[in-house]
Amino acid sequence: MAKRVESPTSINTFKQCKRKYYYQYIEKRPTLSNIHQVRGTIAHSSLEDFFDISLENLTEDNYAQTFRENIQMIFLKHWKDNKKTLDYLGLNNDQEMFYFEETMLMLMNWLNQFIENLEKTVKEKSIDVKEAFNYLKPIREQEYKSEEYWVRGYIDAIHEIENEIHLIDYKTNSSFEFEDSIKLQLAIYSLLYFEKHGKRPSKVGIFFLRHKLKLMKVDEGLLELAKKEINLLHSHTTSSDHIDSYPKCVGPLCKWSTGKCDFFDVCKPFEK
C-alpha cells in the first residue's frame, strides 16, 4: 500500500485508537463538528488576523485600548462568520453565550500578556510601540510538508526572539500540561522545521489560552521521537488496509458523560 501524507492529528489518532484511525483516514468516514473545535478555529483565526491591524493611529497613549477594541471586533467577525456552523451544533442561547464569553476571555488573556511583552520590548530596546508590535509579530499559519517522512503540519506562530526560533501552537483546552500527544505534535513540528531550514528551532511550545505560554527546548531526542512515531505508523499502514489490522482500543474515550467518539455507533466498542 502507498504511504499517506500524515499529520500530528492523524498520528495521535493512530496512537490513541487504531480502529478510529481506520474509520477516519482509511475509510474516510465523516466526523462531526463540536463546539470545542469550532471555537478553537475562531480563536486561531482571530489571533492570526490580529497582527494585520492598522498601526497608523497607534500612539503611546492609546495602544492598549486600540488592541483590545481590535481583537474584540476581529473575534466578533469570526464568530458571526461561523454562525451557520454554530447553529448546526444545536446549542441553546445560554450555552452559545457561555462559549462566546469564555473564548473572548481567552483572547483577552492572551492580549494582556502580549501587551506586557510589548511594554517590556519598548523599554529594553528603546523603540516605540509600533516598532515593538512589528518586532513581536510572528510568521503565522505556515504549512510545512516533509517529502522524506510523508507528514505535514500547520504551525500557528513562528517567533524569532534574540536569534532564537520559537514554534508556538495555540490551544483552548483547560489543561496546562504537556501530555504525550502534545509533546509528539511539537516534536513533529520541530522535525518539519529542521528538514526545511537545516537547523533545529530553539524551543517549541503551546500558548494555553486559558493560562499562558509554556515552552520546551528542542533537542535531538525530540526529533528522534517524531521520526520513530512517524515510521511506526507508516510501517503499519503500508502493510495492511484491512480493518482487522486496526484493533479497537476500548476505554473512556469511546463514550463519556457529555459525548462519544464520532465512530461509536459503527464501531460498537462494548459489544462482544
Task: List each language-model region with its residue ranges.
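Charged, glycine-rich intrinsically disordered N-terminal tails and low-complexity linkers that flank
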Residues: M1-N70
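A generic structural signal for short coil/turn motifs at secondary-structure boundaries
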Residues: T31-N34, S175-E179, L215-M216
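A non-catalytic, helix-rich entry segment at domain boundaries
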Residues: S46-R140
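Metal-dependent nuclease catalytic regions and adjoining charged, substrate-binding loops involved
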Residues: V5-E6, E119, W150, D180, ...
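Non-catalytic protein-protein interaction segments used by genome-maintenance enzymes to assemble
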Residues: I127-I188
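Short amphipathic alpha-helical face segments that pack within enzyme cores
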Residues: I42-S45, L184-L192
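Short amphipathic alpha-helical segments and their helix-coil junctions
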Residues: K18-T31, L86, E164-Y170, L233-D244
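Hydrophobic (often cysteine-bearing) scaffold residues that line and stabilize catalytic clefts
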Residues: I35, R39, Y99, T103, ...
